[in-house]
């Protein structure tokens, strides 16, 4: 979610919500902790490898010094194998943790992308509605202006012809419109008759 802070009379700046800041802080903390754990694991593995190398070298040269014999036939190779298995399990656990963090970051990026798309869609919708409102006002203004011009023209005509003359002119225009309407109705009837004629002929051809 994005809030806006007004700066000056006509501008506003986006300000991230506290929830987004909290999520970003948590992610930064997780990444920092992950880096520290990796460094610690690498240091432990390095120390363990060094100890095992020294033990193996000492065993090959002098045998185990200052140590008891491996219990019940356990050899140093067995201990080395167990240490390697332990390191392997650690690596697998690290991979799983990295996978979970990557999935979390992926979901976070997808959510942020969805929020950006929604914000863009809302902005486009607001711009479209604003444009439609401006066009509606423009049409209304033109209609009002045109109506005012028509009323002014009728008033001037009435003044010029007088009430009786203007009334006779309106009657003449009404008769002309009625005659035009009758002509259009007759043309429509003629067209419908022709359509019906050809439709009957087609039906007769299909029925044969």
From Swiss-Prot:
GO terms for molecular function: DNA binding. A motif (Nuclear localization signal 3) lies at residues 136-140. Keywords: DNA-binding, Host nucleus, Host-virus interaction. One of its GO terms (biological process) is viral process. The keyword DNA-binding applies. It comes from the Viruses. One of its GO terms (cellular component) is host cell nucleus. InterPro entries: HTLV1ZIPPER. Its main location: host cell. The keyword Manganese does not apply. Interacts with host ATF4; this interaction inhibits viral RNA transcriptional activation by preventing ATF4 binding to Tax-responsive elements. Interacts with host CREB1; this interaction inhibits host CREB1 transcriptional activity. Interacts with host JUN, JUNB and JUND. Interacts with host EP300. While mRNA expression levels of HBZ-SI were similar to those of HBZ, HBZ-SI seems slightly more expressed at the protein level ex vivo. Contributes to the regulation of viral RNA transcription by interacting with host proteins involved in transcriptional activation such as ATF4, or CREB1, and by inhibiting their activity. Additionally, HBZ suppresses host NF-kappa-B-driven transcription mediated by host RELA as well as transcription of some classical NF-kappa-B target genes, including IL8, IL2RA, IRF4, VCAM1, and VEGFA. Belongs to the HTLV-1 HBZ protein family. Contains three nuclear localization signals NLS-1 and NLS-2, corresponding to two regions rich in basic amino acids, and NLS-3 corresponding to its DNA-binding domain. This is HTLV-1 basic zipper factor.
């Amino acid at each position: 979610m994005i809030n806006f802070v007004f700066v000056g009379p006509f501008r506003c700046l986006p300000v991230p919500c506290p929830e987004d800041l909290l999520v970003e802080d948590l992610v930064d903390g997780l990444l920092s902790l992950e880096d520290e754990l990796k460094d610690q694991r690498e240091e432990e593995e390095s120390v363990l490898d060094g100890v095992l190398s020294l033990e193996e070298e000492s065993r090959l040269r002098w045998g185990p010094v200052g140590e008891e014999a491996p219990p019940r036939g356990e050899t140093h190779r067995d201990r080395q194998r167990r240490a390697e298995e332990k390191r392997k399990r650690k690596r697998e656990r690290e991979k799983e943790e990295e996978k979970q963090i990557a999935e979390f970051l992926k979901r976070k990026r997808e959510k942020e992308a969805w929020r950006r798309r929604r914000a863009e869609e809302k902005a486009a919708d607001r711009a479209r509605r604003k444009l439609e409102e401006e066009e509606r006002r423009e049409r209304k203004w033109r209609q009002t202006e045109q109506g005012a011009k028509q009323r002014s023209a009728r008033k001037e005509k009435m003044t010029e012809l007088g009430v009786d003359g203007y009334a006779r002119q309106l009657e003449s225009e009404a008769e002309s419109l009625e005659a035009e309407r009758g002509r259009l109705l007759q043309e429509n009837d003629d067209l419908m008759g022709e359509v019906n004629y050809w439709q009957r002929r087609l039906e007769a051809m299909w029925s044969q």
